């Protein structure tokens, strides 16, 4: 079956449905968002943000059409971190087990999802990103203007920033610069309480125009113990920023050009990033990586492969 033969109904879309439609627009796949008659299509693709997926899953369980779920982050761990009841967690695993396929954005997450739910038809489709649509951050001075963008709902995303803050603050105090953190969520108060005492670190809440914040930065920090392939890292690459992460397993195994550093070695890593030439080189590597791995054509073909595999098995 060729891509031209496949039709996909994208149901229960979140605010980021363009992460699917953009790459699919570069394929021969016919698709419709929020179709009135989704079961007239070859495949129903659920695009629910993680914690909103239970009701759509329950409805899809009775479908005669193959149902595929786009796994947005580590959704099963999200259920646990948000303190959902054990009943809801077991219900989610049960409903997930009736899926015909799942599409995470990186293989490690896919293996974990398969091991927990029993879903076997797992195929990876990453995120499409191009520097054409993002600012071109400038590297001309030695003063670091650090930026982090994250989801503040999960302690696994928040705690590493709190842990690294004393080390980063001391470095900035000696060398100048500032670290701005953007994002919203239920742990905003916790983050503010723990970072409010630093003169050179600011928790800024949600940014309406994040692109302008990237344009005014010259290095990204993405410190997390709860992620698959963060969209923010790709946005950093697209915005001509070098990206520094902590040695979380997903980052350590990642083949993209991020700079992984341990807590006590953050000084040395930040020191190297003071050099504008080093930042430009690292940032250029990120943009070249996007061109090689994250074009909409590449991601669209990844979706096509998953859909063909699901249809062949049904």
From Swiss-Prot:
Pfam family, one: Glyco_trans_1_4
Keywords: Glycosyltransferase, Transferase
Membrane-traversing stretches: none
Enzyme class: transferase
Cysteines paired by S-S bonds: none
Keyword Glycosyltransferase appears in the UniProt entry: yes
E.C. code: 2.4.-.-
One example GO MF annotation: glycosyltransferase activity
Family named by the database record: Belongs to the glycosyltransferase group 1 family.
Protein name (record): Putative glycosyltransferase ORF31
């Amino acid at each position: 079956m060729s891509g031209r033969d496949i039709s996909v109904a994208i149901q229960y879309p979140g605010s980021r449905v363009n992460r699917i439609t953009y790459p699919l627009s570069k394929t021969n796949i016919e698709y419709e968002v929020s179709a009135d008659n989704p079961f007239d299509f070859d495949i129903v693709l659920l695009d629910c943000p993680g914690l909103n997926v239970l009701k759509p899953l329950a409805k899809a369980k009775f479908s005669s059409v193959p149902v595929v779920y786009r796994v947005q982050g580590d959704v099963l761990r999200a259920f646990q971190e948000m303190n959902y009841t054990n009943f809801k967690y077991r219900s989610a695993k049960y409903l997930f087990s009736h899926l015909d396929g799942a599409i995470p954005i990186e293989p490690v997450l896919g293996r974990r999802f398969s091991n927990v739910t029993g879903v076997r038809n797992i195929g990876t489709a990453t995120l499409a990103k191009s520097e054409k649509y993002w600012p071109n951050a400038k590297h001309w001075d030695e003063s670091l203007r650090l930026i982090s963008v994250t989801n503040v709902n999960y302690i696994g995303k928040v705690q590493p920033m709190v842990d690294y803050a004393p080390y980063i603050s001391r470095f900035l105090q000696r060398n100048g610069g500032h670290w701005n953190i953007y994002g919203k969520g239920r742990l905003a108060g916790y983050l503010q309480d723990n970072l409010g005492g630093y003169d050179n670190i600011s928790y800024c809440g949600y940014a309406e125009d994040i692109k302008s914040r990237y344009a005014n930065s010259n290095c990204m920090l993405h410190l997390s113990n709860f992620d698959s392939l963060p969209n923010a890292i790709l946005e950093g690459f697209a915005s001509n920023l070098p990206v520094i992460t902590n040695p979380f397993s997903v980052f350590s195994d990642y083949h993209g050009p991020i700079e992984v550093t341990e807590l006590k070695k953050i000084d040395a890593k930040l020191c190297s990033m003071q050099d504008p030439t080093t930042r430009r080189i690292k940032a250029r590597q990120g943009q070249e990586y996007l061109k090689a791995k994250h074009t909409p054509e590449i991601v669209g073909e990844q979706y096509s492969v998953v859909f063909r595999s699901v249809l062949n098995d049904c």
